[in-house]
Amino acid sequence: MGITAGKSMLALLAFLAFASCCYAAYRPSETLCGGELVDTLQFVCGDRGFYFSRPSSRINRRSRGIVEECCFRSCDLALLETYCAAPAKSERDVSASTTVLPDDFTAYPVGKFFQSDTWKQSTQRLRRGLPAFLRARRGRTLAKELEALREAKSHRPLIALPTQDPATHGGASSEASSD
């Protein structure tokens, strides 16, 4: 009951296959240079973009650029991802925070003059100056004042009365002497 040569050869081949798989898993990563490095960075980083040197927050004294890291030394996925740019998030980007409204939600108008399309941005309000309804109110007030002024001019007396009292000038009128 000894081990035959065929069984020992089978065991040796199985061991070599297992050893080669383990070595392939733990071997150093490959090096990337030039166009291959750029293509790999574009694939890994996608729309975020990438840096050839790390951002200033990650710099230490012995920091190297990605070319020195990946072309002359080994390079792996984790190292490549450290050179990806952070996605720029706009302050007005609200796509991440979606508000779910109930199905029975109805929007009621706030007021006649404060519709959302007329009051979009403060810069537009400043460019427009006074809102139309305030200009109309001011115009109505000015129109009333002008009408009152015209009415006062149209109702002038037919005879112009003296502005000063005749008694103060020293002249006596005939009515004052007969009393």
From Swiss-Prot:
PROSITE patterns: INSULIN. Gene3D superfamilies: Insulin-like (1.10.100.10). Residues 92-179 form a propeptide. Disulfide bonds join C33-C71, C45-C84, C70-C75. Residues 1-24 form the signal peptide. Proteolytically processed by PCSK4, proIGF2 is cleaved at Arg-128 and Arg-92 to generate big-IGF2 and mature IGF2. Residues 160-179 are annotated as: Disordered. One of its GO terms (biological process) is positive regulation of vascular endothelial cell proliferation. GO terms for cellular component: extracellular space. The keyword Disulfide bond applies. Pfam families: IGF2_C, Insulin. Residues 25-52 are annotated as: B. Glycans are attached at T106, S154, T163. InterPro entries: IGF2, IGF2_C, Insulin-like, Insulin-like_growth_factor, Insulin-like_sf, Insulin_CS, Insulin_family. Keywords: Carbohydrate metabolism, Cleavage on pair of basic residues, Disulfide bond, Glucose metabolism, Glycoprotein, Growth factor, Hormone, Mitogen, Osteogenesis, Secreted, Signal. GO terms for molecular function: growth factor activity; hormone activity; insulin-like growth factor receptor binding; integrin binding; protein serine/threonine kinase activator activity. The insulin-like growth factors possess growth-promoting activity. Major fetal growth hormone in mammals. Plays a key role in regulating fetoplacental development. IGF2 is influenced by placental lactogen. Also involved in tissue differentiation. In adults, involved in glucose metabolism in adipose tissue, skeletal muscle and liver. Acts as a ligand for integrin which is required for IGF2 signaling. Positively regulates myogenic transcription factor MYOD1 function by facilitating the recruitment of transcriptional coactivators, thereby controlling muscle terminal differentiation. Interacts with MYORG; this interaction is required for IGF2 secretion. Interacts with integrins ITGAV:ITGB3 and ITGA6:ITGB4; integrin-binding is required for IGF2 signaling. Interacts with IGFBP2. The IGF2 locus is imprinted. Paternal inherited gene is expressed, while the maternal inherited gene is imprinted, hence silenced. Belongs to the insulin family. This is Insulin-like growth factor 2. The lineage of its organism: Eukaryota, Metazoa, Chordata, Craniata, Vertebrata. The gene is IGF2.
